[in-house]
């Protein structure tokens, strides 16, 4: 009993002496604790998470044993605490750690980053409260204290770090080779706290510089066409890029609320019941949607001309009309828009403001072929700001947050339905041989299950499933109309938005390197997609879902 008593007394003394450091450590390690708890619910704990946790503990031991004035140490660590707060937010809401991919999205797509904050401000506020409490109490407890140092423990922890990093690097080199990629892989996998945040920041700088290089390559790249058929007969091609519009809330796909009454009445509309996106982020999905390159090779997507530039090279007058804000912080989408001959942005307007602009463009055709790209706000958060009051027809069934959000979202879909049907009327009235393609960049989470997820970026059946259809005026040639009938056979096949550029090359009669008949929805060679996509955690080769099941939920 005396041994247990002595041990308990020593433990109590240690706790009294070290509690401020332990509290601060606990907060820094909280993203890892949350990730470990998440993994414990699975059959197997991710070895990388366990490795990262051990490396983090070793770094914290070095910081504790190497300096006596822990108050100053943790004061200097304030930026890392802020990064840990963001990290914890991502783990709790998206199940992902803070990586260079997320940092790059924030750096190159300021609008998407600020929209994320607007969506999740409650969650962020809660984390800030916890941070202020832990950090404030911990610093107060350390103020005026000088704690003992342990040179031996510090050296032992450093030796453990050398061994841990070294073993992982040797493993990486054995799989690949001793080169730059091996070093970058070690940096990318270092998600320890606090030093791992420096690794992710350094990798972000590398990726940002690479992205600027891709943009320079893109500007210098040339479109290599091998042929443009005179028999295609398409005079006007309109491509509407939607925003955050998931099929679960479209009555066109079986949703009980009549959110798409106009589209349901349109003859000749070919919808896709199992359409998936290539990323649940606009900054990645839109470039992929307009590229011939696979999402597995982002470098090629970023450095080569898009469908906009291809159609321009094929002799189409190209237009980029957008109700989205101009993103002056970089990214690929502004570069895609720059490939068009004519550009117009209607910022802070409802999507309906694009209709008179489109009408004016159509009136200028004068027999020339036109390719018109419309980038709309669609159903982007905040949903209540996406439609005028005349379209506020759906009311919340109760005062719950989910019912309020769902009603606003449904009204935004209703407004998009009106926009798209209005475009169809304009194309029909123009008497041009026209084709309309619509695809949303990604879907959206609407507090659908116990996880209470809102927004996009998670990579699940709600934000990876997306809406898309093809429609044409009734005056196309008989050959073209027969060709479009093949789309009926694709209705229930799993299809990626990556197929649309290849399909449009076929319908426009354009041949060029990079065209892939296995991705062409009009080709007999077409193969159903495995729906590969990019997440903040990296490339994911497959995704499987059934929208018919989801729509019935």
Write out the residue ranges for each language-model feature.
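SF2 helicase/translocase ATPase core recognition
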Residues: 466-468
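Short, P/G- and charge-enriched loop/turn segments at secondary-structure junctions
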Residues: 224-227, 452-459
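Metal-dependent active-site segment of extracytoplasmic phospho-/sulfohydrolases and closely related
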Residues: 238-239, 415-454, 501-505
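Transmembrane and membrane-interface helices of multi-pass
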Residues: 2-189
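A long, amphipathic alpha-helix that forms part
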Residues: 59-60, 220-226, 396-436, 470
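Short beta-strand segments
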Residues: 320-322, 371-378, 410-413, 435-440, ...
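Membrane-interface soluble catalytic domains
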Residues: 2-25, 37-44, 65-71, 139-143, ...
């Amino acid at each position: 009993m005396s041994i247990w008593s002595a041990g308990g007394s020593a433990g109590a003394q240690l706790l009294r002496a070290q509690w401020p450091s332990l509290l601060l450590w606990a907060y820094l390690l909280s993203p890892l604790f949350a990730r470990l708890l998440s993994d414990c619910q699975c059959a197997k704990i991710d070895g990388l998470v366990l490795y990262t946790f051990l490396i983090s503990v070793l770094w914290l031991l070095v910081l504790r044993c190497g300096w006596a004035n822990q108050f100053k140490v943790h004061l200097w660590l304030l930026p890392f605490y802020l990064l840990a707060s963001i990290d914890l937010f991502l783990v709790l809401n998206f199940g992902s750690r803070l990586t260079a991919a997320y940092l790059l999205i924030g750096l190159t797509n300021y609008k998407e980053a600020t929209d994320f904050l607007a969506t999740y401000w409650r969650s962020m506020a809660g984390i800030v409260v916890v941070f202020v409490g832990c950090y404030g109490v911990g610093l107060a407890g350390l103020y005026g204290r000088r704690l003992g140092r342990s040179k031996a423990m510090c050296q032992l922890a450093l030796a453990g770090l050398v061994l841990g990093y070294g073993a992982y690097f040797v493993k990486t080199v054995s799989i690949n080779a001793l080169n730059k990629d091996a070093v970058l892989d070690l940096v990318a996998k270092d998600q320890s706290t606090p030093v791992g945040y420096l690794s992710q920041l350094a990798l972000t700088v590398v990726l940002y510089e690479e992205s600027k290089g891709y943009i320079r390559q893109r500007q210098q790249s040339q479109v290599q066409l091998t042929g443009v058929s005179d028999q295609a007969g398409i005079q006007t091609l309109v491509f509407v890029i939607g925003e955050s519009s998931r099929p679960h809330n479209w009555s066109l796909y079986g949703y009980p609320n009549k959110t798409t009454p106009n589209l349901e009445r349109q003859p000749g509309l070919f919808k896709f019941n199992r359409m998936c996106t290539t990323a649940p982020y606009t900054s990645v999905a839109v470039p992929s949607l307009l590229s011939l390159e696979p999402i597995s090779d982002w470098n090629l997507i970023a450095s080569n001309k898009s469908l906009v530039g291809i159609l321009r090279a094929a002799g189409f007058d190209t237009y980029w009309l957008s109700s989205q804000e101009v993103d002056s912080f970089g990214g690929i989408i502004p570069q895609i828009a720059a490939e068009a001959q004519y550009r117009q942005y209607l910022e802070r307007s409802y999507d309906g403001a694009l209709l008179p602009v489109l009408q004016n463009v159509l009136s200028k055709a004068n027999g020339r072929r036109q390719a018109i790209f419309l980038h709309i706000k669609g159903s982007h958060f905040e949903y209540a700001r996406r439609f005028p009051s005349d379209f506020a027809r759906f009311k919340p069934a109760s005062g719950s947050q989910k019912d309020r959000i769902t009603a606003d979202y449904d009204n935004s879909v209703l407004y998009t339905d009106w926009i798209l049907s209005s475009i169809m009327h304009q194309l029909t009235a123009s008497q041009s041989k026209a084709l309309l393609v619509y695809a949303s960049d990604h879907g959206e989470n609407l507090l659908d299950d116990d996880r209470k997820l809102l927004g996009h970026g998670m990579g699940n059946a709600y934000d990876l499933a997306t809406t898309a259809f093809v429609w044409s005026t009734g005056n196309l040639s008989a050959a073209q109309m027969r060709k479009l009938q093949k789309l009926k056979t694709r209705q229930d096949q799993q299809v990626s938005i990556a197929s649309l550029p290849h399909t449009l090359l076929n319908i426009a009669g354009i041949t060029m390197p990079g065209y892939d008949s296995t991705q062409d929805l009009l080709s007999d060679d077409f193969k159903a997609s495995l729906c590969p996509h990019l997440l903040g955690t990296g490339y994911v080769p497959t995704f499987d879902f059934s929208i018919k099941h989801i729509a019935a939920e």
